[in-house]
């Protein structure tokens, strides 16, 4: 069964909502930064000196870093270069999908309004013969997480809420 064990993170793809794209534009070797945290604001209650309440203030999303071997011809690289070289920023959305053994999405992260923040190329060294790796750092507004179980739970919660209202 696909859900009997934690999923391996080596089979994934990234799809940008950009045109043009090339076959290599979905291929990355590493993705980091799909992190969200809640910022809290302390609030002191009058007459209560033992503690302060921590009220949720806003969500903070970390930068997304995409790494891959350097390819010739990339619509993603063209988009990023226009931003960092010409200061032409065009926000775009992207979908990151973790795939199963049949190449079907198991988990999805939809990243909204991403723009390039930095573009870096790994060191080039004639003595090592390593693959040249490009790193693209994106800043974005937020991401949404989708998987079959959470979609089913959201749908069930919506159905039960409507049943409770109709009773």
Name what the model sees in each region.
Residues 1-167:
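Glycine-rich, low-complexity intrinsically disordered segments
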């Amino acid at each position: 069964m696909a859900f009997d064990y934690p999923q391996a993170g080596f089979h994934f793809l990234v799809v940008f909502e950009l045109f043009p794209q090339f076959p290599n534009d979905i291929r990355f070797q590493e993705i980091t930064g799909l992190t969200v945290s809640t910022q809290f604001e302390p609030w002191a209650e009058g007459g209560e000196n033992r503690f302060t309440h921590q009220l949720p203030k806003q969500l903070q999303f970390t930068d997304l870093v995409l790494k891959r071997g350097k390819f010739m011809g990339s619509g993603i690289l063209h988009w990023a270069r226009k931003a960092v070289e010409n200061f032409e920023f065009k926000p775009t959305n992207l979908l990151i999908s973790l795939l199963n053994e049949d190449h079907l999405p198991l988990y999805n992260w939809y990243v909204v309004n991403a723009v390039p923040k930095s573009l870096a190329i790994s060191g080039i060294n004639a003595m090592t013969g390593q693959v040249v790796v490009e790193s693209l750092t994106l800043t974005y507004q937020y991401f949404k997480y989708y998987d079959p179980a959470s979609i089913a739970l959201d749908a069930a919660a919506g159905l039960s809420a409507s049943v409770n209202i109709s009773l």
